[in-house]
Regions:
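C-terminal transmembrane helices and immediately adjacent loops/tails
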Residues: 1-158
């Protein structure tokens, strides 16, 4: 869902003021690939942290559910990171309502997996406590927070 929403992103007003990219440089440049790897590492680390926390608190079912939920939410939040080079504070969270709707629909679907008994059975989802759900949300938000802080610092808007 976030990928479709990003496709609906309004064009950057400063796009024509930027110098053209080097035609000899591939689409996947070294700096861009580095950003992708770093962002993937952050999401992966948050997911592994959630799994470890869940395993220590309730075994494999809780660990898997926390990891699944953290990864799902982190990817939904990451859609906002992929909107452009500017931070969310510069772009405005609501400037692309498709991204907000994608987040909402994704959260509703994830909650269905976590709280609808039939879907819990299909996905082998464990019952999470309130503190575990809070940990999932905070863990999923952490990569986006780091990426947004980096964007603000690199743009000089922090």
């Amino acid at each position: 869902l976030p990928a479709i929403a990003i496709g609906m992103e309004p064009a950057d007003r400063d796009l024509l003021n930027q110098p053209p990219r080097d035609p000899k440089e591939g689409i996947l440049s070294f700096p861009f690939a580095g950003k992708i790897l770093f962002q993937g590492f952050l999401i992966g680390a948050a997911t592994m942290w959630a799994w470890e926390m869940g395993y220590s608190q309730g075994g494999e079912a809780i660990a898997s559910t926390m990891a699944f939920s953290t990864l799902t939410l982190a990817r939904l939040f990451h859609g906002f990171n992929c909107r452009g080079r500017k931070s969310l504070l510069s772009l405005g969270i609501g400037s692309n309502l498709w991204c907000v709707m994608a987040l909402f629909v994704g959260v509703v679907l994830m909650c269905a997996v976590l709280f609808v008994p039939q879907l819990q059975d299909v996905f082998a989802a464990g019952d999470l406590t309130g503190s575990q759900l809070l940990a999932v949300v905070l863990g999923a938000l952490a990569p986006t927070a780091v990426i947004q802080i980096y964007k603000m610092m690199s743009a000089g808007t922090a």
